[in-house]
Amino acid sequence: MIKVGINGYGTIGKRVAYAASIQDDIHVSGIVKNTPDYMAYLASRSFNIYVPDDDKIKEFEDHGIKVKGTLNDLMESSDIIVDATPEGMGMENIKIYKKKRVKAIFQGGEKSNIGDASFNAYSNYNESFKREYTRVVSCNTTALARTLYPILNDYGIENLNVTLIRRATDPNDNRKGPINAIEPSMSFPSHHADDLKTVLNLNNVYTVALKAPTTLMHVHSIEVLLKDDAKIDDIMESWLKYNRILLIEGKDNFKSTAQIMDMARELRRDRGDLYEIAIWRDSVKVIDKRLYYVQAVHQESDVIPENIDAIRSLSGIDKNESIEKTDKSLRISGGIFYGKE
């Protein structure tokens, strides 16, 4: 049994904690919360609560939340820490983990040089195999790697152009925006290009990113110059080999991200999450050697299977065994939405 502690219980941390808790080979030692808020209270129903340091214990107990110990205590009872703290804190936290000689997994908001490797389950699982520290790439990069890996494997990629329409913030965040604007990234390519190269062997990658006033999902418009010829049916066949890709169609009333997330809620998974990357089949076109498609990304959850697989990769568990266990436990099945042509 792999003992795992979760440092940070926000959008990603709480989902990793749940996903880890339903694995038959992972035990959640506890979670670290910094503030004794409603989320800490709810978490205490399912997990041992730890705090960053001794100074926080009384604050939590004054709010009626029992504290098991501090981060130091959690590290002593864990084989691996999943660091889901706010962006940028990982560089400080890794010093603590190294001092305690505990393995750690970081999130995509950290710089790529924070660990021994960056991680995507499909494309480079073994680069983190039995390592000490790895970083699960961001929600956008995870989505791109997941749908491009089959294409790269089967047909090769000469050139890649991606326009990323990013959600402004997550549904529970009242601090960020924009609210009534579209905000373009002024860097070209956006940081997603270099991030993608940390998990896929690609050279010519060009990305443009824009923030839109929505909280539901990201949307990517993708153009791939293939090395080898392929037909649309060939591309579909490649994607259908991978459970974490879901093929949907506009004619089934998937007109927008609103309907996709409505479908996800109806699946009755934890928190109404959609772990798979949804590709509109209607959008897939091949002209000469250029492949075009549009995909939607549930930014709150697509990296969760990756975090579970990263735990097993650091622990020396086989790639295919891990992916199969993760998919089965989270009810990830992918394929064509209605299960037939």
UniProtKB/Swiss-Prot annotation:
Location within or outside the cell: Cytoplasm
Catalytic activity annotation: D-glyceraldehyde 3-phosphate + phosphate + NADP(+) = (2R)-3-phospho-glyceroyl phosphate + NADPH + H(+); D-glyceraldehyde 3-phosphate + phosphate + NAD(+) = (2R)-3-phospho-glyceroyl phosphate + NADH + H(+)
GO biological process assignments: glycolytic process; lysine biosynthetic process via diaminopimelate
Binding site for D-glyceraldehyde 3-phosphate: 138-140, 169, 192-193
EC number: 1.2.1.59
Signal peptide boundaries: none
Example of a GO MF term: glyceraldehyde-3-phosphate dehydrogenase (NAD+) (phosphorylating) activity
SUPFAM superfamilies, per database record: Glyceraldehyde-3-phosphate dehydrogenase-like, C-terminal domain (SSF55347), NAD(P)-binding Rossmann-fold domains (SSF51735)
Pathway noted in the entry: Carbohydrate degradation; glycolysis; pyruvate from D-glyceraldehyde 3-phosphate: step 1/5
Gene3D superfamilies in the record: Dihydrodipicolinate Reductase, domain 2, NAD(P)-binding Rossmann-like Domain
Pfam families: DapB_N, Gp_dh_C
Keywords: Cytoplasm, Glycolysis, NAD, NADP, Oxidoreductase
Active-site residues annotated for this sequence: 139 (nucleophile)
CDD domains, sorted: GAPDH_II_C, GAPDH_II_N
GO cellular component annotations of the record: cytoplasm
Chief localization: cytoplasm
Binding, NAD(+): 11-12, 109, 167, 299
InterPro entries cross-referenced by the UniProt entry: DapB_N, GlycerAld/Erythrose_P_DH, GlycerAld_3-P_DH_AS, GlycerAld_3-P_DH_cat, GlycerAld_3-P_DH_NAD(P)-bd, Glyceraldehyde-3-P_DH_2_arc, NAD(P)-bd_dom_sf
Family the entry assigns: Belongs to the glyceraldehyde-3-phosphate dehydrogenase family.
Matching NCBIfam families: GAPDH-II_archae (TIGR01546), PRK04207.1 (NF003251)
Protein's name according to its UniProt entry: Glyceraldehyde-3-phosphate dehydrogenase
Organism of origin: Picrophilus torridus (strain ATCC 700027 / DSM 9790 / JCM 10055 / NBRC 100828 / KAW 2/3)
